[in-house]
UniProtKB/Swiss-Prot annotation:
The keyword Signal applies. The keyword Signal applies. InterPro entries: Bact_solute-bind_prot3, Lys_Arg_Orn-bd, Solute-binding_3/MltF_N. GO terms for biological process: amino acid transport. It is found in: Periplasm. GO terms for cellular component: outer membrane-bounded periplasmic space. This is Glutamate/glutamine/aspartate/asparagine-binding protein BztA. Part of a binding-protein-dependent transport system for glutamate, glutamine, aspartate and asparagine. Its main location: periplasm. Pfam families: SBP_bac_3 (PF00497). Residues 1-22 form the signal peptide. Keywords: Amino-acid transport, Periplasm, Signal, Transport.
Length: 338
């Protein structure tokens, strides 16, 4: 490990120790607002709309947590963060939770003293090129210029992939997705590399989307999910189970529209615990027993959130793939509410 990396990790750990000395739950309640670290602008995942209101797949997680804790999904302040600033912002207490398409890795989990509490999107890194480049495989990119975001796993995966395939490239460093889209569109790089979901989002926003192809290779595993500070385990539990309430709701056929009807009629013990009709799940994490119910009502279940923001009917057009429910061949399921 390089000394700079070591001292950087130590500094982050020190920030976390200070920030976690007080309860995040107490801070959020006292403030009356959840502060959520977010992407500066990734269409479908987290981006302000024409009215400046943040919308997207990751935004829905922030709304679910705010609804669970504060009773109102709109009581969220979104702080746009780059790949380089996001973890420091969380560690220092600038944000309460980070939901910014961030990959769960060994070093981030251990050295940075941060906790990834769930995976809300299973992804992998890919490459995007203009059809005019005349390549159909990432293994044909030898000597190419590649737009890549600094401070990310993308940067490291890119180096590994080219080294493993005995190829060379010239990186064109970018700070965020918006800059990557701009430089790629301007021809500053031959290819843009990031998570495949991010590529689909970027392509959808470009005027010449029909002329852009996402190459078939997926060169990494990118489990993306919400992150909290290490040491405040109760807050981690709140974020984790607020998210899993959305996943469980989809499994049991509970939607934003039918939740009240299901709650009034169900005899399924798991659903009754999930919706706070039996047991004391909420009390175990410092909330009331309707916390999961409010989380679901914020934006709907996991499937509703996926389809509304990034699904097949949207301009992003992502298939569920690995993010389908376990009953549908995917990896997505919630631990038992018991």
């Amino acid at each position: 490990m390089k000394k700079s990396a070591f001292f950087g990790s130590v500094a982050l750990a020190a920030l976390v120790a200070g920030a976690a000395s007080a309860s995040t739950l107490d801070d959020v309640k006292a403030r009356g607002q959840l502060i959520c670290g977010s992407n500066p602008g990734l269409t479908g995942f987290a981006a302000p709309d024409a009215n400046g209101v943040y919308q997207g797949f990751d935004v829905a997680v922030c709304k679910a947590v705010a609804a669970a804790v504060l009773g109102d999904p709109m009581k969220v302040k979104y702080v746009p963060l780059t790949g380089e600033t996001r973890f420091t912002a969380l560690a220092s207490g600038e944000v309460d939770v980070l939901v910014r398409n961030s990959t769960w890795t060994f070093s981030r989990d251990t050295e940075l003293a941060l906790d990834f509490v769930a995976v809300n999107y299973y992804d992998g890194q890919g490459f995007m090129v203009n059809k005019s480049l005349g390549v159909s495989s990432a293994k044909e990119l030898d000597g190419a210029t590649i737009c890549v975001q600094t401070g990310t796993t993308t940067e490291m995966n890119l180096a590994d992939f080219f080294k493993a395939n005995n190829m060379t490239y010239t990186p064109v460093n970018i700070a965020d997705d918006a800059e990557g889209q701009q430089k790629f569109a301007a021809g500053a790089c031959d290819s843009y590399t990031t998570d495949a979901s991010g590529l689909a989002s970027s392509r959808a926003t470009l005027p010449n989307a029909a002329d852009i192809v996402i190459l078939p290779e997926i060169i990494s595993k990118e489990p993306l999910g919400p992150v909290v500070r290490h040491g405040d385990n109760n807050w981690g539990d709140i974020v984790r189970w607020s998210f899993y309430a959305l996943v469980a709701a989809e499994e049991y056929g509970i939607t934003k529209a039918n939740l009240e009807e299901v709650a009034a009629s169900t005899q399924n013990p798991e659903i009754r615990r999930l919706l706070g009709l039996e047991g004391d799940m909420g009390k175990k994490i410092g909330l009331d027993n309707d916390f999961a119910k409010r989380a679901i009502l914020a934006s709907g279940n996991y499937g509703e959130v996926f389809e509304a923001n990034i699904g097949a009917s949207t301009s992003i057009g992502l298939a569920r793939g690995l993010n389908a429910q376990w009953t549908q061949g995917g990896l997505m399921y919630a631990p038992p509410f018991r």
